[in-house]
């Protein structure tokens, strides 16, 4: 019995590797029923009329790409399928490439053109100050887009002078910058805001949901998979849920097994 408590960690790693590859060998589908906070975000965007403006701030870097990039893709599929005008930006320097790739790739699927159907403003340092500047005059905050084109007069920004004119905003974040979007953005300039965050940050969102400072949130890969289900375009998040769930079950089994052996050997002593 005691030998079982001293299993070589490499054996555990092998089991985890097998759990991850099971889905590749024997593909199976998992049902991911959407939660109410995900549905709230979906319903808000789905209720917008054609040519409404949705701002998406891609405030994350490659370290959290696996959780947040699927959210970005699902949101873009939803927006472009409804012919909404997307305004993309980032307050994280390392998020620039991720944001641009997502917007260009999904936009191309729907035949969307930069400057006309969407605009990518790129990165600007300053976080809270950038949000405040956008709240007063978006053309002062971003005089040019990521590609060096003048933002003034862009068809994609028609009718938008500041954050007050945004129909909906989403902050995809791996850090605490969502608070700046709430305090200096939503509260000051009165626009609806949703958040996409890593799974570990999910519990932090509930107080803001309760105070109605957020309309909803997507938490981790599961939140992204739920949104894909609602949009009807299952992509990377839905594919990632199966191996993730198998590994989670395996870890729980290891914990239960370890506790059982521990108490069993303890009684003998």
Where are these regions (language model features)?
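Membrane-embedded segments
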Residues: 63-119
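Acidic/histidine-rich, surface-exposed loop or edge segments in extracytoplasmic proteins
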Residues: 52-61
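N-terminal positive-inside, membrane-proximal cytosolic segments immediately preceding the first
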Residues: 1-7
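Hydrophobic membrane-insertion alpha-helices, especially the h-region
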Residues: 10-26
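Alpha-helical transmembrane signal-anchor/signal-peptide segments
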Residues: 30-50
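Membrane-proximal low-complexity regions enriched in glycine and acidic/polar residues
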Residues: 115-203
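Structural recognition of alpha->loop->beta junctions
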Residues: 101-128, 211-229
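C-terminal functional extensions of proteins
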Residues: 3, 196-269
């Amino acid at each position: 019995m005691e030998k079982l408590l001293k299993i070589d960690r490499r054996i555990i790693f092998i089991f985890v590797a097998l759990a991850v590859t099971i889905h590749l060998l024997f593909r199976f589908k998992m049902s991911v029923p959407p939660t109410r906070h995900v549905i709230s975000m979906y319903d808000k965007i789905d209720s917008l009329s054609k040519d409404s403006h949705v701002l998406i701030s891609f405030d994350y870097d490659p370290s959290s790409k696996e959780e947040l990039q699927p959210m970005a893709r699902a949101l873009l599929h939803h927006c472009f399928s409804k012919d909404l005008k997307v305004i993309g930006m980032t307050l994280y320097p390392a998020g620039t490439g991720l944001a641009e790739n997502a917007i260009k790739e999904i936009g191309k699927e729907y035949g969307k053109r930069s400057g006309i159907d969407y605009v990518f403003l790129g990165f600007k340092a300053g976080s809270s100050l950038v949000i405040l500047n956008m709240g007063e005059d978006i053309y002062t905050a971003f005089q040019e887009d990521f590609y060096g084109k003048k933002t003034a007069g862009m068809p994609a920004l028609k009718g938008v002078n500041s954050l007050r004119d945004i129909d909906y905003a989403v902050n995809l974040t791996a850090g605490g910058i969502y608070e700046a979007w709430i305090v200096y953005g939503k509260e000051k300039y009165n626009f609806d805001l949703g958040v996409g965050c890593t799974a570990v940050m999910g519990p932090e969102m509930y107080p803001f949901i309760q105070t109605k400072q957020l309309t909803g949130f997507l938490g981790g890969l599961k939140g992204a998979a739920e949104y894909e289900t609602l949009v009807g375009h299952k992509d990377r998040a839905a594919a990632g849920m199966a191996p993730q769930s198998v590994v989670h079950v395996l870890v729980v089994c290891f914990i239960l097994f370890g506790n059982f052996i521990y108490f069993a050997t303890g009684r003998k002593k």
